């Protein structure tokens, strides 16, 4: 869909610093075709350009559901929930600017210690066993991925049927069930 294309290209440019020439090549290669259900869909005219796009999109998909991303969001949510339960902040406070919210977190010694601990996180570790005396979580996530249509000599086909390499990488990404404990790593 157009919105998925927009955020994929936007992130490719802003987060992953994709060269402008590659982004232009991707946009210039698109056309509207009919998918398997005879519905209009954006398609690629050339497999080489679809390959550039799918590498970018899969990299983003993996990044957005990485252990680091899932853990940091869950740990922050749990920290804010605890702050709310302790009366340190309200839901309305979350609509204020970050310095105000951080000031509230620092006003309570228990929450301030948790906040300072959160700020020291440099990554994550994971395993099948939950470590003792350690904040660890199992976190599922919705996976988004793209298998675009590409023009071939046989007509329009999904890129996974054209590129065995992409098909394998996409299958591996989709197979991850997040059935592991994740906890913070500190330097």
Task: Give the residues covered by each predicted segment.
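Histidine-centered, transition-metal-coordinating active-site segments
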Residues: 1-187
């Amino acid at each position: 869909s157009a919105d998925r294309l927009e955020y994929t290209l936007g992130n490719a440019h802003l987060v992953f610093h994709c060269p402008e020439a590659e982004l232009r090549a991707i946009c210039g290669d698109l056309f509207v075709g009919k998918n398997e259900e005879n519905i209009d869909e954006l398609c690629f005219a050339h497999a080489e350009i679809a390959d550039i796009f799918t590498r970018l999109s899969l990299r983003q998909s993996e990044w957005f559901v990485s252990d680091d991303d899932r853990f940091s969001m869950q740990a922050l949510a749990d920290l804010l929930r605890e702050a709310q339960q302790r009366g340190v902040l309200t839901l309305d406070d979350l609509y204020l600017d970050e310095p105000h919210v951080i000031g509230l977190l620092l006003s309570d010694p228990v929450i301030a210690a948790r906040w300072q601990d959160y700020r020291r996180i440099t990554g994550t570790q994971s395993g099948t066993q939950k470590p003792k005396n350690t904040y660890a979580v199992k976190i599922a996530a919705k996976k988004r991925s793209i298998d675009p249509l590409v023009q071939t000599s046989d007509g329009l086909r999904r890129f996974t049927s054209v590129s065995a390499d992409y098909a394998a990488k996409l299958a591996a990404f989709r197979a991850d069930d997040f059935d592991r404990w994740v906890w913070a790593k500190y330097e």
